């Protein structure tokens, strides 16, 4: 699936089928956000105990019921592996999976920089496209920046990562 932004600020998705035929469709950005969040929230490959974890940090959001524990394994300044345990809403689970995809394999310094960019984005601080690119799919979480009830869900695991990477 290719995603391209057109002049009307809608996204144009180009679906390729197995027979190489292409079908184009215009969709609103909210539809793409919803589908991306659902896809990330359903992923399970990062949800497991992490043997040899060098850090563990629990995050709890009583307003939504999210209770997620982030586990990290660092070695020689590299984030070697990250996983999580617990349960949360679709937003917190998707956000956690995005975070793990983002920081796994990076140096601690690179991961800290991504966290800084993320928190600036969520606070509505202006940032360059280049800065935001380091967030990958996590950029869509900016959608929740102005939703007081959901921003806690979107940032929960990122706060845990911030503690673990200090």
Which sequence ranges carry the predicted segments?
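Charged/polar low-complexity intrinsically disordered segments
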Residues: 9, 22-24
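Active-site- and interface-proximal helix/loop "cap" or "latch" segments in soluble metabolic
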Residues: 73, 84-143
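Structured beta-strand/loop patches that form or line metal/cofactor-binding pockets in enzymes
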Residues: 43-86
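Secondary-structure capping and boundary motifs in well-ordered enzyme cores
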Residues: 64, 91, 146-150
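C-terminal binding/interaction regions
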Residues: 26-46, 116-166
């Amino acid at each position: 699936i290719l995603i391209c932004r057109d002049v009307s600020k809608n996204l144009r998705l180009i679906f390729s089928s197995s027979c190489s035929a292409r079908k184009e469709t215009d969709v609103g950005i909210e539809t793409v956000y919803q589908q991306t969040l659902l896809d990330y929230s359903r992923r399970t490959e990062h949800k497991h105990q992490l043997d040899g974890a060098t850090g563990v940090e629990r995050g709890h959001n009583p307003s939504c019921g999210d209770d997620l524990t982030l586990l990290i394994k660092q070695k020689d300044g590299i984030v070697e592996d990250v996983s999580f345990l617990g349960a949360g809403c679709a937003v917190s689970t998707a956000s956690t999976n995005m975070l793990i995809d983002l920081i796994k394999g990076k140096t601690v310094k690179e991961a800290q920089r991504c966290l800084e960019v993320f928190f600036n984005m969520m606070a509505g601080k202006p940032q360059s496209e280049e800065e935001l690119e380091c967030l990958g799919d996590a950029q869509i979480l900016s959608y929740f920046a102005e939703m007081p009830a959901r921003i806690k869900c979107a940032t929960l695991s990122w706060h845990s990562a911030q503690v673990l990477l200090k």
